[in-house]
Amino acid sequence: LAGVLFDEVALMPRSFVEQAMARCSVAGSKFWFNCNPENPGHWFYVEWIKKARERNILYLHFTMDDNLSLAPEIKARYEGMYTGVFYRRYILGLWVKAEGLVYPMFDRSAHIVPKVPALNPRHRYYVAVDYGTVNPFAAGLYDYSPSEQKAIMVKELYYKGGSNNRVDNEAYYKMLCDLIGDYPIQYIIIDPSASSMIETIQKYGKYMAVKADNDVLNGIQDVTKFLNAGCLYFHKSCKSTFEEFETYSWDEEKAEDAVIKENDHSMDQLRYFCRTALRNELKWIV
C-alpha cells in the first residue's frame, strides 16, 4: 500500500490502525486521518495530535463554520442538539474530559408534563427494562406520537428488591403486566444480559422481548440529543427517574469516558429506549 485514509479514526481500535499502517510499504507512503474529538486520554490524541510536530504531521482543526455549504439554520439545528461535553467535542472540536452531570440539560420545568395523553391508535407504545435482582428493577412505559414527533415516559416501575425483598422473574413479569395495563405496546426492550427474564416474557407469548442496544456512550448521546431537541418528556409521576437525572454523573477518575455506576437503573432503561426504539422513530427527523 502507498497510503490509507482512516475515516473516524477515533472510533477504530489502535491495533487495527497500526496494522494498516504497517502494510504501507511503498516509499513515501502517506496517511490521512479525520475524527471527532474524544476523551483527551484517547490513544490517537496522545500519540498523534499531541505529537504532531514530532511526527511531521499537518494537523488541521475544523468546525462547522469552515463548511461553507451548511446553511445557517442547519448549523443552528446541529448546535442545538448537544450540550456539555458533547457540545464542546462535536461542535467546538475540543478534546475535553467528561465531567459533572451526564444530563445537565434536563430541566424539570421543561421536560415534565402534568397529564398522561389518552390512548391513541396512531401512537406507538414501548416498555424499556433495566433488570436487577439485588439492584433495583427499573422499567418505563413510553408513548410515542408520530404526528408530534415526541415521546413521553408516561409511567415508571422502580422496585428495590435488595437482599431481603428479592423476588423471582414471575413476580417481575406480573409487575410489567401491571405497568403495561391496556397499552398496546410494540415490544419490551430489555437489558441484553437478562436472559432469564427474556425467557419468562417469551414463555407467556403476550409480549415480544427485544434485546436493547447497550452501547452506553452512543446511547447517552441519543438521550442528550432528544432532550435538547424537545423530543423526550416525562410524566410528573416518574419521580425515581427525576432523582437519577439529578445525580447521574461522569466518573472523573477514569481515563476513558465512563459513568459512575450508582443509582443509574432508570437512566439505563431510558437509554435502552432511546437507543433501540426512539432513534429509529426519529432517524429521518433528528
Where do the model's predicted regions map?
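Short, glycine/acidic-enriched loop or turn micro-motifs at the edges of active sites
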Residues: 10-11, 133, 146, 194
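Mg2+-dependent endonuclease catalytic cores in nucleic-acid-processing enzymes, primarily RNase H-like
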Residues: 140, 147-261, 278-285
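ATPase catalytic-site recognition across NTP-hydrolyzing enzymes
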Residues: 67-131
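ASCE P-loop NTPase helicase motor core
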Residues: 3, 11-81
